[in-house]
A protein has these predicted regions:
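N-terminal acidic leader/helix
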Residues: 2-32, 75
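Intrinsically disordered, low-complexity segments enriched in glycine/proline and serine/threonine
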Residues: 11, 33-35, 50-52
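Short E/K-rich amphipathic alpha-helical oligomerization segments
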Residues: 27-43
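Short, charge-rich amphipathic interface segments used for partner binding and complex assembly
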Residues: 38-67
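Long amphipathic alpha-helical segments
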Residues: 64-78
Length: 78
């Protein structure tokens, strides 16, 4: 991504966040992870931690893409 301008990065990230397939994929993964966590035995700490970690990583990915859009927007404003 070194060759992309800030504007190109912002536009690409916004396209991802607005893409119905991308949104569906995130929502589906979040639901599947929650269901997987809910179905684990209370003493299956390893599986619960795996679900928790996957959920956090999914959130971080979305937050990173969102921050690219916000950074591009702020660069335009300033």
């Amino acid at each position: 991504m070194e060759n992309m301008t800030q504007e190109e990065r912002e536009r690409g990230a916004k396209l991802l966040l607005d893409n119905p397939l991308f949104v569906e994929a995130f929502e589906t993964l979040e639901k599947e992870l929650l269901l997987s966590w809910a179905r684990t035995n209370s003493n299956d700490v390893s599986q619960r931690e795996s679900c928790w970690l996957a959920t956090r990583l999914l959130e971080r990915l979305k937050a990173h893409i969102t921050s690219i859009v916000e950074t591009g927007h702020m660069a335009k404003v300033l």
